[in-house]
């Protein structure tokens, strides 16, 4: 597909413009016939429907959808020339733009993707990372590689695709190696309950073995915990009682049980920016840093401390 075809097929064939915003003195209580003053701020407006997506300063450089998709393709080309366009979406009315490109010949149990996300509301700069989709359950996991390195919107913007590609290539290798390790590491009952307690942000004073006590957690929290445990049981049954199965239990919950169909029908925004993303990131950090963290705590758990 050409760039123009991608924009059209993805309903991203619209542009944004920066327009000055005006204000009045507060005591006028919005009098349309009174004098208006330039506020010093600008609105970022879609040119097709006139919707204001965000507010910015004069220094902010708006980025067009065409540029975002083109930069994503440049990054993917620098990482691995053997890629295909997968999808592009406008999130939350176009406030953010998401582009995903599939790395061909991924093989194995999951497909691998490069993703790029940028904003039209000024909330983030161009950010990037690696995602994977487990074929058996369609669980998606998005891991950013750009934290602290996102590309800001300035007139001299330079995405430095080669440098970004090095970050992503290193992340691809690291993720693959960690997943291999997860598949060969058993998940104990303690690890499961520790993950549940951590991702659900239950009080640290709660004993993992007593989470179900109605006097300790609310009914709503108990129902959420029970649903997460059901998802973990499903995935560990299918994928084995391993940390890989445990991780997929969490991602199954965030992918298939947490929903906001009105704002996020694709389910992508929640996996990138909302609590679902935080839960996945917490679970990933826990299982990939198992070592002494789990071992020391499990000894206390087994000793009844």
Q: Language-model features: where?
A:
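Hydrophobic, Leu/Ile/Phe/Ala-enriched alpha-helical segments that form helix-helix packing faces
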Residues: 68-80
